[in-house]
Each structure stands twice: as C-alpha cells, then as structure tokens.
Design a protein with these regions (language model features):
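Phosphodiester-processing cores and adjacent nucleic acid-binding clamps
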Residues: 1-175
C-alpha cells in the first residue's frame, strides 16, 4: 500500500523481454505488476537517451500501454546536473570514478568488456520542456510523471551526505 512502481529502464524486466523480442512475455509481466501494485500505481517507464535499444523499445512500450491501459511515465536517468556536465564527463578527472561506480552498481569489473558505460551524453537532469519535446508523441507520459511526483511526499536536506547504515557481522577482511 502506498507504493508506486515503474517498469524500469532497459535493465527492467519488461524492457528486457522487449529487447529479447518477447512482446507477449513483456505484456504478461506488465499485467502481473499492474495486478500486484494496482492500476493506479503501476506505470510503463519510457526513456529516450538516444540508445538503440531504448529507441527500438519505445514504440513497443507505447503499444503495450494502449493495449493494456497501463499508463506511461517519461523518465530520464540523471547522472549529471547539466547537459554541459554530461558532455564533459568523458574529459573530466572524475570520469574514471563514475565508471568505477557504475561497475560497482552493476557488479562488473572494469576489465569486463560488457561493463556498463554511458553511450550518449543524455544522462543529465532534463527540464520539463526538454522532456516534453522528447516525448511529443505521448504527452500524457510527461503529465503522468508530474502526477507521480505530486503524489510523493519527500523532503531532502541538501548539503548533507546520506550514507546507509549497515553492519558487517562476521566479516574481518573486506577484500
């Protein structure tokens, strides 16, 4: 109760099925999540970072929404504050740190040729106007994202670093 669920990015279950050419499986999965979270709490997440698989999945997600009545929500992975920061990421000193953090997040090694990296410079915090332009064919997706934000009651204290608290009982060596 009180949870809102989005289908996720390319790594999400629905998108993975679409990427694998399993439209029926994607539809079945989406309907299962809608049943689990409720029709008013489950959204098909659409993104457009100019990545091939996202562009390929986008029309399928729109079709899936129209066939099932599951609403769309337009989102953007924001790893940088501005477009300029995103463009500079490959030249910045902290680019290596960003790559290391992505490897930690995805459980990959820098030596793994399949480790995650940003294919485009679109991973920045986009304005409402930019999102509306990206999703001009489905304006309801941007509207739904705003409605989701209005339903969330979160206050962030800026200027303070928030780290999770956890214990490592029984661990004596972190290597």
């Amino acid at each position: 109760e009180g949870l809102i669920c989005l289908s996720g990015c390319l790594a999400g279950e629905v998108a993975q099925k679409l990427t694998g050419d399993d439209y029926a499986g994607a539809k079945e999965t989406a309907l299962r999540y809608r049943t689990l979270f409720g029709a008013e709490n489950y959204f098909l997440e659409i993104q457009n970072h100019q990545i091939r698989d996202e562009l390929r999945n986008l029309p399928q997600l729109i079709r899936l929404s129209r066939e099932t009545g599951i609403p769309l929500a337009a989102t953007n992975d924001a790893h940088y504050i501005t477009k300029e920061d995103a463009k500079m990421q490959s030249r910045r000193e902290d680019a290596a740190m960003q790559e290391v953090l992505l490897c930690i997040q995805t459980g990959k090694s820098l030596d793994d040729p399949e480790h995650m990296h940003f294919e485009t410079n679109e991973f920045y915090l986009k304005s409402t106007a930019e999102m509306a332009a990206l999703f001009a064919d489905v304006p309801e997706a941007v509207t739904n994202t705003a409605k989701i934000a209005e339903r969330c009651h979160v206050e962030f204290q800026t200027g303070k670093i928030w780290l999770p608290k956890f214990t490592m009982d029984g661990v004596s060596d972190c290597r």
